[in-house]
UniProtKB/Swiss-Prot annotation:
<dbReference type="InterPro" id="IPR007120">
    <property type="entry name" value="DNA-dir_RNAP_su2_dom"/>
</dbReference>
<keyword id="KW-0808">Transferase</keyword>
<dbReference type="Pfam" id="PF10385">
    <property type="entry name" value="RNA_pol_Rpb2_45"/>
</dbReference>
<comment type="similarity">
    <text>Belongs to the RNA polymerase beta chain family.</text>
</comment>
<dbReference type="Pfam" id="PF04563">
    <property type="entry name" value="RNA_pol_Rpb2_1"/>
</dbReference>
<keyword id="KW-0548">Nucleotidyltransferase</keyword>
<dbReference type="InterPro" id="IPR007645">
    <property type="entry name" value="RNA_pol_Rpb2_3"/>
</dbReference>
<dbReference type="InterPro" id="IPR037033">
    <property type="entry name" value="DNA-dir_RNAP_su2_hyb_sf"/>
</dbReference>
<comment type="function">
    <text>DNA-dependent RNA polymerase catalyzes the transcription of DNA into RNA using the four ribonucleoside triphosphates as substrates.</text>
</comment>
<dbReference type="InterPro" id="IPR037034">
    <property type="entry name" value="RNA_pol_Rpb2_2_sf"/>
</dbReference>
<dbReference type="InterPro" id="IPR010243">
    <property type="entry name" value="RNA_pol_bsu_bac"/>
</dbReference>
<dbReference type="GO" id="GO:0003677">
    <property type="term" value="F:DNA binding"/>
</dbReference>
<dbReference type="InterPro" id="IPR015712">
    <property type="entry name" value="DNA-dir_RNA_pol_su2"/>
</dbReference>
<dbReference type="Pfam" id="PF04565">
    <property type="entry name" value="RNA_pol_Rpb2_3"/>
</dbReference>
<dbReference type="GO" id="GO:0003899">
    <property type="term" value="F:DNA-directed RNA polymerase activity"/>
</dbReference>
<dbReference type="InterPro" id="IPR014724">
    <property type="entry name" value="RNA_pol_RPB2_OB-fold"/>
</dbReference>
<dbReference type="InterPro" id="IPR019462">
    <property type="entry name" value="DNA-dir_RNA_pol_bsu_external_1"/>
</dbReference>
């Protein structure tokens, strides 16, 4: 399974996975890079850019016209100029890595004819305008802002569109479901349509006061009749002699309860007796028998509603309006008969006017409810004008409406593209939900849309259709960097637009250029604000490569326009079936953010609409193909998807008849026939994130512990010597490559030169004549990460090695041979040990400390600035007043510490003096001044010193000078060193270029007839290599041959060579010029020095360690090697863990890892013995056989030559690395087989002896190798002590916390403890002289200095604060110091 790569041949992982992976895992930081590239579109494609990203922003804001339409500013195109500084320079100088944006604008000035108002073009001017800097993304998907690396986290938010929901019966006490619809645009006003408890439908705009929904429809231009005809069908009741004839429709009459007999209108027969219910089946049978119409009496029309206005055709008088209810009054003296009224008009009066039929609304109160009709009758607005005024009053209370303003306001709410944008996503979602067919370029609402929303909502109330699930991933989408940035830039441009309009109207438009109208500050400020202070722009977590990659793949539901922690309920945080393969169900923080911050699954990607997609293999007629299709959550709902571990035969057919699938909209797990399966997962690990996919035996761990395991891997500190895990999952190489920690070769080539800081590769493929044939890779040496861990890269190649494109040529922090290596493999015994591993404590062997197994390097950065103060400039110097020569021993003549110096707390790093204010002189000073002239010293020492708790070695010093300030010797030395480095790069590249070009030239000229040449060359002699060697290479160009084609080729080559040479020199000069130029420093700063101190942290009691299965603990004791438990062969355990940590936590994965790790080490030992034997006998056959036993027929091992095989054997002798992918890993039988292969007992347990007594323990102990990590919670960063230090201003008590160099809080409970012991004097000290008795603590200090131990406590300052507080409340409290020795009265004692 191992790829044939340069590092893959040096270490081969035995692969336990059974499932062939069809899909390539996408690049892990693609989310970031693709999104931002799409936003910027740096290279303009031929035919112009598409309307998206930055282009779309400019297109939406421009053209800008002035208020009188006499001129117009149009956008033509934009381009980026190259950035001023590259990424490294920005990191060092504390600048933002950004490119200047240049926009071409066209100003058109019109002539307006005063009579006709027609416009004609008078003048057109085009100009390039600078529009601020746009930050660029680095190769690794981060941004460098003010010198620090930041990541823009993608945001999950509710997709624009329409959503239907109900209140789950919570609003009204009866538990009635109140339905509501909400139209959410990408930007603009929200529209809510909702039912109240009385079944009246209301609309709300932007969560304001509600208005009847019919008012909204009036405002849209409908009248009452149109509203009713939109929502209800019309039925004609015809008047006959006997009564009313009504058409019979089975679906309408089902469930109809009869009061009188139902009579067939044609035959007069009774179809159904009175008092019975017409069932669905009976209704259908009647229709089949040919029942056409029924005869109804007046009383059965009561409760129906009129569908149209009834108008007197002669007079135009309205009898009854649409929506009026039919009522009946009993006729006096007659029980049966009633008189029918329509509204207030008697039916008789209507029939007398010649009306033969009555149009009624089809409302049966069962299938169709009268909600809209009731709303209409409850609505006090009757016309469009009233409705518009009403809406205006809701939106702008307190302003008197005019018809014009009300109309404009309503128009701008939903129908104006400037103010309202559904976005393409919103339109697509809306079309899908409401079965509309508007094009996705139509981004505002239409009348049809609003009516369709109301119709669907009323349908829900009538029991048709389903509500939406807002946690479904089809209803949530991701906004990545590009989109967030686009929104931000649009805000900036809109701010700019206002200023431009005003300026266009105020200046003489004929004389100005576009440049004069534009002030790019608002746009630049919006961008700066977004990158600097947005909640989604985060300081990158750079603890190790995994934490970087995870940070870039994070999805947050928080942030502007998202949720807040407090408001987010359970449902939002929960795992949803649609998360499968899209969002990891495991990796999320513990605590208040749980479920709101998620991680993208390994194979997931974000599509152009912002929905998360996951890949599936297509299944055709029961056969699984290798075609991979990406589906979003909405699309997946229609298909049945099988899991990746379903068994297949050789042809890819399912071996079982019934397959376990996820099917239907709810994604329930069901069994379905093989031929009905549509898709199959591509890989078992597609449902988890990168961090979770790095946990072997994840399937055997409890979810809570797996969550902790994936989160703690991100806190692992890079160790001095990284070691890849014996038991991995096969993801390690992918993470190392994609995170950018390890360096991959850009082109195939041969290693030309190498040292610890750079690798030079001579390319042998992809040779582009316009580019150089040399790749120079600069390695990062001892650089500080954001979390102060150490970034250090080490080469893996030797001179002459051949590498292919994409091969790993250098390891970075936490990588080992191109694989992620967060911790170390250590020998663990699971057993209690004298209580030292109680409650998850960890017992360590001294070997771990001695051999620096868990030692890490941390780099602390300190900076000092020399400012220009009112009293004069500060100065960085070695000449500091009142400081001994001993204290200055590490400083050079410029007052800056040497590189390599060992420093400890309190040492001076950079000497600095600050001018002191003039203080009035005493007579003695005046006398001394008169005698000795110049006063002693008017400066004070403000040097940069090492803070408490830091001790280490200086690894780097950087000096920054303001323009025009003379550089000191140290700054010049650093500059010289840097220039030498650049010159070496240039010379090496030049040498390889010369070698390549002159080599090719010699090949071309060899054995050619020479017609001309340099001085001393005889004409018409043959040119051979020997002839060429006689002349310097620069003169070879003078040789000429009669072959014209050859000469043309040589000429082209020479031109190319000259250009490359010139380009090289130019690049070098540019860099040198940048170096020698002054630095851009904050205002008032003359000079700045940064000092980097490398601190070596060995592991010690109090440090936190963890495995990959959520098994975390704190080191409790470090025991001498000889006291640790040991095995029969004398090997001592490195770590002793408590076995009680496993059962209750249910993370059994760690035990399986222990057994498998034990087998790996055992097999490694065997390989080591075989190699030792080889050195004696020179026979490689046993090694090949041993490897075959372990790996089976591995292609890579077969292809190795003897030298490579020995190197591989040596790499494997510590332990054979294996990969057990998640959900598809080694089974119990595999582990037992490996243990037997290694020569161990299949139980995985060994006899162990006590190191202190040498006795055998009573029973066997589980022993094996676990991959342990040292986490970032180091005791050195937390422990803290103080004797004297800063005090709070008001209470005069010591400050708190390590950062403020504060004291320890002696709180209420601690006081109780001392009171309980009766330690009165100790307590008094704690509350007075050790805290806030100002006079007392000074006296104590003096007494201790004198060696005296008598002191007394005074009044604490907080008592005075209390007195002042009481006075401020108007209580005059005085403190009387009575010195009288009179005892208090006796009753006071009681």
């Amino acid at each position: 399974m191992a790829q044939q790569t340069f590092t893959g041949r040096k270490r081969v992982r035995k692969f336990f996975g059974h499932i062939r992976e069809v899909a390539e895992m996408p690049n892990l930081i693609e989310v970031q890079k693709a999104s931002y590239d799409q936003f910027l579109m740096v290279a303009e494609p031929p035919g112009g850019r598409d309307d998206e990203g930055l282009q779309a922003v400019f297109r939406s804001v421009f053209p800008i016209s002035d208020f009188s339409n006499a001129s117009m500013l149009e956008f033509v195109r934009y381009e980026f100029e190259p950035p001023k500084y590259d990424v490294d320079e920005c990191r060092q100088r504390g600048m933002t890595y950004a490119a200047p944006l240049k926009v071409t604008l066209r100003l058109i000035v019109f002539d307006i004819d005063e009579e006709t108002g027609a416009r004609s073009v008078k003048d057109i001017k085009e100009q390039d305008v600078y529009m601020g800097d746009i930050p660029l993304m680095t190769m690794n998907g981060t941004f460098v802002v003010n010198g620090t690396e930041r990541v823009i986290v993608s945001q999950m938010h509710r997709s624009p569109g329409v959503f239907f929901d109900h209140d789950k019966g919570k609003t009204h006490s009866s538990g009635k479901l109140l339905f509501a619809a909400r139209v959410i645009p990408y930007r603009g006003s929200w529209l809510d349509i909702e039912f109240d408890a009385k079944d009246i439908v209301f609309a709300r705009i932007d969560r304001r006061r509600k208005i009847p929904v019919t008012s909204l429809m009036f405002a849209l231009g409908l009248d009452g009749e149109e509203i009713l005809s939109t929502f209800y069908n019309k039925i004609l009741y015809k008047r006959t002699k006997e009564g009313w004839r009504v058409p019979f429709d089975a679906s309408r009459f089902r469930g109809y309860s009869t009061v009188n007999d139902l009579i067939d209108a044609d035959t007069g027969k009774v179809v159904l007796e009175a008092g019975k219910k017409l069932t669905v089946r009976a209704a259908r049978q009647l229709q089949e028998k040919g029942l056409k119409a029924l005869r109804l009496s007046d009383s059965e029309l009561v409760g129906n509603y009129l569908a149209e206005d009834l108008v007197n055709p002669k007079t135009g008088e309205i009898f009854a309006e649409a929506g009026d209810e039919l009522t009946g009054k009993p006729i006096k003296g007659d029980d049966k008969e009633i008189e029918l009224f329509v509204g207030a008009t008697p039916m008789k009066a209507i029939l007398e006017q010649g009306y033969k039929e009555l149009p009624l609304l089809d409302i049966d109160h069962v299938n169709v409810g009268p909600y809209i009709r009731n709303t209409l009758s409850a609505d006090k607005n009757m016309t469009r004008e009233d409705a518009l005024f009403d809406i205006y009053r809701v939106m702008r209370p307190g302003e008197p409406p005019t018809l014009d303003s009300a109309q404009n306001m309503f128009q701008s709410l939903f129908f104006d593209a400037e103010r309202y944008d559904l976005s393409a996503v919103g339109r697509v979602k809306m079309n899908m939900r409401l079965d509309l067919d508007a094009p996705d370029t139509h981004r505002t609402l239409r009348k049809e849309d609003i009516l369709a929303v109301i119709k669907t909502l009323v349908g829900l109330r009538d029991g048709k259709g389903e509500i939406d699930d807002i946690d479904h991933l089809g209803n949530r989408r991701v906004r990545s960097v590009g989109e967030l940035m686009e929104n931000q830039y649009r805000i900036g441009l809109l701010r700019m637009e206002r200023a431009i309009k005003e300026r266009m109207s105020s200046v003489d438009i004929d004389t100005v250029m576009p440049q004069d109208l534009i002030n790019a500050k608002p746009a630049a400020a919006a961008v700066r604000e977004f990158f600097g202070s947005s909640q989604l722009s985060q300081f990158m977590d750079q603890t190790n490569p995994l934490s970087e990659i995870t940070h870039k793949r994070r999805l947050s539901a928080l942030g502007p326009g998202g949720l807040t922690r407090e408001r987010a309920g359970f449902e939002v945080r929960d795992v949803h079936p649609t998360h499968y393969g899209r969002i990891c169900p495991i990796e999320t923080p513990e605590g208040p953010n749980i479920g709101l911050i998620n991680s993208l699954a390994t194979f997931a990607r974000v599509n152009k609409y912002g929905f998360v997609e996951t890949p599936y293999r297509k299944v055709k007629e029961g056969r699984v193909t290798d075609e991979v299709v990406y589906l979003s959550a909405m699309e997946e709902g229609r298909y049945a998807v099988a899991q990746a571990n379903i068994s297949l035969d050789a042809k890819g057919r399912f071996t079982d008849d019934l397959i376990v699938c996820r099917a239907g909209g709810t994604r329930d797990v069901v069994l379905i026939p093989a031929d009905q399966v549509d898709y199959m997962d591509v890989s078992p690990k597609q449902l988890v994130s990168v961090a979770a996919a790095l946990i072997p035996f994840l399937e055997n761990d409890d979810a809570n512990r797996a969550l902790m395991g994936s989160n703690m891997q991100r806190q692992a500190v890079p160790l001095v010597r990284a070691e890849a895990p014996f038991v991995g999952t096969g993801m390690e190489g992918v993470v190392a490559r994609d995170s950018g920690a390890a360096i991959a070769a850009r082109r195939t080539g041969v290693i030309d030169q190498i040292d610890a800081t750079r690798i030079v590769i001579r390319a042998t493929e992809d040779l582009d004549p316009t580019k150089s044939g040399v790749d120079i890779y600069r390695l990062m040496k001892y650089q500080r990460s954001n979390q102060s861990t150490c970034i250090n890269q080490r080469p893996l190649v030797k001179v002459g090695d051949k590498v292919a494109k994409g091969d790993i040529i250098a390891d970075g922090p936490s990588t080992d041979l191109g694989e992620l290596a967060l911790g170390r493999n250590v020998l663990v015994a699971f057993m209690p040990w004298n209580g030292y591993n109680f409650e998850d404590s960890i017992l360590l062997s001294e070997r771990i400390v001695k051999e620096d197994v868990f030692t890490s390097i941390h780099i602390e950065e300190f900076e000092v600035m020399a400012r220009d103060t009112k009293l004069g400039p500060e100065e960085i110097t070695r000449d500091i007043p009142n400081v001994s020569e001993e204290a200055l021993k590490n400083l050079d003549e410029a007052g800056i510490v040497y590189i390599g110096a060992e420093v400890r707390a309190g040492d001076i790093l950079v000497g600095k003096i600050t001018p002191k204010g003039e203080s009035p002189m005493t007579p003695e000073e005046k006398l001394l001044r008169a005698i000795f002239g110049e006063k002693a010293s008017d400066v004070r020492d403000t040097s940069l010193r090492v803070p408490p708790g830091v001790q280490g070695t200086i690894v780097e010093v950087r000096v920054f000078n303001r323009h025009g300030v003379d550089k000191d010797e140290r700054a010049l030395a650093i500059e010289r060193e840097e220039i030498e480095r650049l010159a070496k790069d240039r010379d090496d590249e030049q040498a390889i270029l010369d070698r390549n070009v002159y080599g090719r030239l010699a090949d071309l000229l060899d054995n050619r007839q020479g017609v001309a040449g340099p001085k001393g060359f005889k004409k018409d002699t043959k040119i051979t290599r020997a002839v060429l060697e006689e002349y310097p290479k620069s003169q070879w160009w003078l040789f000429a041959s009669p072959n014209d084609k050859l000469m043309a080729e040589i000429e082209a080559m020479r031109k190319q060579y000259d250009e490359s040479k010139k380009g090289l020199e130019q690049r070098f000069l540019d860099k040198v010029e940048k170096l020698q130029r002054g630095d851009e420093l904050p205002p008032g700063v003359m000079k700045m020095v940064k000092v980097f101190v490398a601190v070596k942290r060995k592991i010690q009691p109090g440090d936190k360690m963890a495995g990959r299965h959520g098994n975390k603990g704190v080191v409790s004791k470090i025991v001498p090697i000889e006291d640790m438990p040991f095995l029969e062969d004398g090997t001592h355990a490195d770590i002793v863990l408590n076995p009680l940590g496993v059962p209750s936590r249910m993370n059994v994965g760690q035990i399986l890892e222990t057994h498998l790790g034990w087998a790996c080490a055992g097999m490694g030992k065997k390989i080591g013995q075989t190699i030792d034997a080889y050195y004696q006998r020179q026979d490689l056959k046993p090694l090949r056989e041993t490897l075959k036993k372990i790996y089976g027929d591995d292609e890579t091992i077969k292809s190795l030559d003897d030298g490579e095989l020995i190197e591989l054997g040596r790499n494997l002798s510590h332990g054979v690395p294996i990969a057990t992918p998640v959900f598809d890993g080694a089974k119990e039988a595999d582990i037992e087989e490996m243990l037997k292969l290694a020569g161990f007992d299949a139980s995985g347990q060994s006899t162990v002896y006590d190191g202190r007594t040498g006795d055998e323990f009573d029973r066997k102990v589980t022993v094996g190798y676990i991959y342990m990590l040292k986490l970032h919670h180091l005791v050195d960063d937390k422990i803290h002590a103080r004797s004297i230090g800063p005090y709070s201003l008001v209470t005069q008590q010591p400050l708190g916390g390590k950062a403020q160099f504060g004291g320890q809080r002696f709180g209420e409970m601690e006081v109780w403890a001392l009171e309980a012991y009766g330690a009165a004097y100790t307590l008094q000290e704690m509350l007075t002289v050790k805290s806030d008795d100002v006079a007392g603590r000074t006296k104590v200090y003096e007494a201790i200095v004198r060696g005296d131990d008598t002191f007394e406590a005074g009044i604490p300052e907080s008592f005075n604060v209390l007195v002042k507080e009481m006075r401020s409340l108007g209580l005059n409290v005085d403190l009387h110091n009575s010195k009288l020795g009179v005892p208090p009265p006796a009753e006071a004692a009681e």
